[in-house]
Swiss-Prot record:
Keywords: 4Fe-4S, Amino-acid biosynthesis, Branched-chain amino acid biosynthesis, Iron, Iron-sulfur, Leucine biosynthesis, Lyase, Metal-binding. The lineage of its organism: Bacteria, Bacillati, Actinomycetota, Actinomycetes, Mycobacteriales. The gene is leuC. HAMAP family: LeuC_type1 (MF_01026). Belongs to the aconitase/IPM isomerase family. LeuC type 1 subfamily. Pfam families: Aconitase. Heterodimer of LeuC and LeuD. Its cofactor is [4Fe-4S] cluster. CDD domains: IPMI. Its EC number is 4.2.1.33. This is 3-isopropylmalate dehydratase large subunit. It comes from Mycolicibacterium paratuberculosis (strain ATCC BAA-968 / K-10). Catalyzes the isomerization between 2-isopropylmalate and 3-isopropylmalate, via the formation of 2-isopropylmaleate. [4Fe-4S] cluster binds at C357, C417, C420.
């Protein structure tokens, strides 16, 4: 990758700079560009057929040193020393282990101190760095864009292509700027920003775009908060999300196991500091949010765009002027068993899930512990707190957070994707309602017939205590 000297005639966006630095072969006007990939992350669900393709063709993994695998989607978060009960999940995990051993790919299996959700593991090890291209057979690869990387999910055939060549044929994306300026009110978090954005532009609003998040409110976020925002770019329909690196980024990366050291750090910093959108660069689309007007947000329906402030009520489909929107709302309310006009704070839950690649990091767990400390989970509510990685779990234990969770009556688990999706034992029963810090509230996402409300960690913790959708301020 070269250093942008600022002499380019046409001002470029951050996404365009990273793209240009990774073009191996230009496709011109009619063909895709061939893009070099700096980091390829792999898990057990989308990789088996890709490795099979390599095996059939007699090809090795081109750059095993730039490839990292971890077990996350299918793994249990209790009794991890026992065999996985579900035969499909067990087969996928065992297949990943055999493939990584055969092709020389690093793997962090269950029980390893570095195992966890792939989008938590990469950043915490310092593997994800500004200006990189990052891919994974997982839609929420956009998480890594918080570092100023161009990161996107890919399909299994593309996973095979990257394993074989360390490149990917891609057509340039459109660009969108999401400007969030002003000071966030107390109790409003990164999760509330992204839920409010998706409610504003819809789940298709970012289709075909790479979103760059900008403005003073974004700059004020920690790296954990930035990862939350970029993680859910996909729920807005975008291909990727990015935030320009700054001092917050550099301090997070400094001294991480795989971060550059010494002279290499200095050289990397010279490149990283060029990774900003040029003055005068033009975005295809621009969106504005006033940070001061935001409040804790929660979804009421079955897609992430069906959300309202916690202080609001379940919307009335009859008041919606768009036919498709009205029909979708009616269908969602029927599935969610909600009535228009019901205050969101009156909605009782059966379960609370804290975790996922959206909100399973140490900062998220600290927020939850602050709310739970000295309090109890409401009777009849089951609360799961699942760290995004074993490293996060170890840090939480060192800070005494695990004791806070268990004293409150929550279940303190091992690392994994857990109740974010119904691919492991952590699932809702039909008809159960859950406040979840994850990223998707589709029908059956957390288990057949389960009903999901997407919330921030702060709202999740307060909800667990009150038993109804709540913010920490409601506990005072």
């Amino acid at each position: 990758m070269g250093i942008d000297t600022g002499t380019t005639a046409t001002p470029r966006t951050l996404a365009e700079k990273v793209w240009d630095d990774h073009v191996v072969v230009s496709g011109g006007a009619n063909e895709p560009d061939l893009i070099y990939i700096d980091l390829h992350l792999v898990h057990e669900v989308t990789s088996p057929q890709a490795f099979d393709g390599l095996r059939l063709a007699g090809r090795p993994v081109r750059r095993p040193d730039l490839t990292l695998a971890t077990e996350d989607h299918n793994v249990p978060t209790v009794d991890i020393d026992k065999p996985i009960a579900d035969p499909v999940s067990r087969t996928q995990v065992e297949t990943l282990r055999r493939n990584c051993a055969e092709f020389g790919v690093r793997l962090y299996p269950m029980g390893d101190a570095e195992q966890g959700i792939v989008h938590v593991v990469g950043p915490q090890l310092g593997l994800t760095q500004p200006g990189m291209t990052v891919v994974c057979g997982d839609s929420h690869t956009s998480t890594h864009g918080a570092f100023g990387a161009l990161a996107m999910g890919i399909g299994t055939s593309e996973v095979e292509h990257v394993l074989a060549t360390q490149t990917l044929p891609l057509r340039p994306f459109k660009t969108m700027a999401v400007n969030v300026d002003g000071e966030l009110p107390a109790g409003v978090t990164a999760k509330d920003i992204i839920l409010a954005l998706i409610a504003k532009i819809g789940t298709g609003g970012g289709q075909g775009h790479v979103i760059e998040y900008r403005g003073s409110a974004i700059e004020s976020l920690s790296m954990e908060g930035r990862m939350t925002v970029c993680n859910m770019s996909i729920e807005a329909g975008a291909r990727a999300g990015m935030i320009a690196p700054d001092d917050t980024t550099y301090e997070f990366l400094r001294d991480r196991p795989h971060a550059p050291k010494g002279a290499q750090w200095d050289a990397a910093m010279r490149y990283w500091q060029q990774l900003r959108t040029d003055p005068g660069a033009v975005f295809d689309t621009e969106v504005y949010l006033d940070a001061a007007s935001l409040s804790p947000f929660v979804t009421w329906g079955t897609n992430p765009g069906q959300g309202v402030p916690l202080a609001a009520a379940v919307p009335d489909p009859e008041l919606m002027t768009d036919d498709a929107e009205r029909q979708a709302a009616e269908k969602a309310l029927a599935y969610m068993d909600l009535r228009p006009g019901t205050p969101m704070r009156d909605i009782a839950v059966d379960a609370v899930f804290v975790g996922s690649c959206t909100n399973g990091r140490i900062e998220d767990l600290r927020v939850v512990a602050d709310v739970l400390r000295g309090r109890k989970v409401a009777p009849g509510v089951r609360m799961l707190v699942v760290p995004g990685s074993m490293r996060v779990r170890a840090q939480a234990e060192a800070e005494g957070l695990g004791e806070v969770f268990t004293a409150a009556g929550a279940e303190w688990r091992q690392a994994g994707c857990s109740m974010c999706l119904g691919m492991n034992p952590d699932q809702l029963a039909p008809g159960e309602r859950c406040a979840a810090t994850s990223n998707r509230n589709f029908e059956g996402r957390q288990g057949k017939g389960g009903r999901t409300h997407l919330v921030s960690p702060a709202v999740a913790a307060a909800t667990a205590v009150r038993g109804t959708l709540s913010a920490p301020a409601d506990l005072d």
